[in-house]
């Protein structure tokens, strides 16, 4: 039988059955009743998982060595596994209010190990979560002395700290219009007792802005007891804004433009304060330090801020050498440094004010000082009496003459 290309399918009847001659004979595979294929194994399922999830699964085990040196592993407790999961997703937690403090301390440490407070994406929310629930336990005292770069980089995170009792911002160059003023004068820092604002380029306008919420709305810094305003451009006019601090007990005005005159004495008499004869130890910054759960977080921020690469000053020095001004600039810088050192050496006498009760209840050193003064007075009077001329002394009596003749 001849089959052409133009012809279609040809069917032939054989043994009473009709079949197609031109079509390719295909055999359908028999149906399989298996649930899994022959090459399916549990190991293949593990290999298909992402590497990150496998690394997290290893955290659920504790690997140890026994005395024989063989490796053994044990499964962590359900509490530890749950704590790790919450720490990995702490930024998605709604609230920790009512959560036990002991568990919160462990959760804070676990989140710190995972870098939740160092990442800019999660640091602000994570700190806010803990500060709203535990307040001063997270951070009670914050020392940012001369850390102006840290303030500019971590301003949003610093704003989350509530219930601070001591804040040291000495030498941070804030000026009169810094964004941190809103945080200092907010209700979040109504519990602040000590505030160090020395060497911040503050003027009377900055002091007015700092005290505005207390003077107008009676909010913010209402419990302030110690204030450091040393080395700022503050005059007698700016001191009138301090009358709103009813609980103020100690004030430092060293290195300012305040002149002691009769009007200033009247102002401090109205404040119930007097000039301290000896420098107060509260303004030495020795007792101020960072305290709380977030102490290591602040240190880690400072370390990461210090790791930022510095700009190469080589193009600048090359330009100075090309124009022949390197020597001139160096001389100017040296002269400025010498003048600054001279000003630091020739600092004014510490001007510390305190409440009259505190001044009256002086330390034992003050008592010894007063006794020393009284002794000096006695010695001076005796010396004056001995140095007096003979003519001004009383004449000898008859009994005195007889007594002298008996010798």
Swiss-Prot record:
The keyword Repeat applies. Residues 360-389 are annotated as: Disordered. InterPro entries: Leu-rich_rpt, LRR_dom_sf, LRRC42. LRR repeats lie at residues 138-159, 163-184, 191-211, 223-243, 247-268. Disulfide bonds: none annotated. SUPFAM superfamilies: RNI-like (SSF52047). Keywords: Leucine-rich repeat, Repeat. The keyword Oxidoreductase does not apply. Belongs to the LRRC42 family. This is Leucine-rich repeat-containing protein 42. It comes from Danio rerio.
């Amino acid at each position: 039988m001849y089959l052409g290309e133009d012809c279609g399918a040809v069917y032939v009847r054989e043994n009473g059955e009709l079949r197609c001659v031109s079509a390719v004979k295909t055999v359908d595979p028999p149906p399989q009743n298996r649930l899994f294929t022959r090459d399916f194994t549990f190991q293949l399922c593990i290999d298909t998982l992402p590497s990150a999830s496998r690394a997290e699964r290893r955290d659920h085990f504790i690997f140890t060595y026994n005395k024989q040196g063989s490796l053994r592993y044990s499964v962590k407790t359900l509490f530890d596994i749950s704590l790790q999961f919450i720490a990995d997703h702490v930024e998605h937690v709604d609230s920790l209010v009512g959560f036990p403090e002991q568990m919160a301390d462990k959760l804070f440490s676990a989140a710190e190990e995972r870098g939740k407070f160092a990442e800019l994406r999660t640091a602000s929310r994570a700190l806010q979560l803990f500060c709203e629930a535990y307040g001063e336990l997270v951070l009670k005292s914050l020392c940012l002395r001369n850390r102006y770069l840290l303030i500019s980089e971590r301003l949003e995170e610093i704003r989350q700290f509530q219930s601070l009792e001591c804040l040291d911002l000495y030498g941070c160059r804030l000026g009169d219009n810094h964004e941190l003023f809103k945080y200092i004068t907010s209700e979040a820092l109504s519990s602040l007792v000590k505030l160090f604002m020395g060497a911040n380029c503050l003027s009377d306008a900055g002091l007015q802005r700092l005290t505005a919420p207390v003077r107008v709305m009676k909010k913010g810094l209402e419990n302030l007891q110690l204030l450091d305003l040393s080395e700022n451009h503050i005059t007698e006019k700016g001191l009138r804004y301090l009358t709103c601090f009813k609980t103020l007990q100690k004030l430092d005005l060293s290195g300012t433009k305040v002149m002691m005159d009769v009007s200033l004495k009247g102002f401090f008499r109205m404040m119930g304060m007097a000039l301290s004869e000896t420098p107060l130890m509260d303004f030495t910054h020795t007792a101020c330090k960072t305290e709380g759960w977030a102490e290591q977080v602040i240190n880690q921020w400072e370390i990461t801020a210090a790791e930022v690469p510095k700009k190469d000053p080589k193009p600048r020095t090359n330009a100075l050498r090309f124009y022949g001004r390197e020597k001139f600039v160096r001389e100017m810088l040296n002269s400025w440094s010498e003048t600054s050192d001279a000003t630091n050496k020739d600092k004014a006498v510490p001007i510390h004010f305190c409440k009259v009760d505190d001044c009256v209840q002086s330390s034992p050193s003050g008592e010894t000082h007063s006794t020393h003064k009284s002794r000096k007075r006695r010695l001076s009077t005796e010396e004056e009496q001995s140095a007096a001329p003979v003519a001004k002394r009383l004449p000898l009596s008859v009994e005195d003459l007889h007594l002298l003749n008996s010798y």
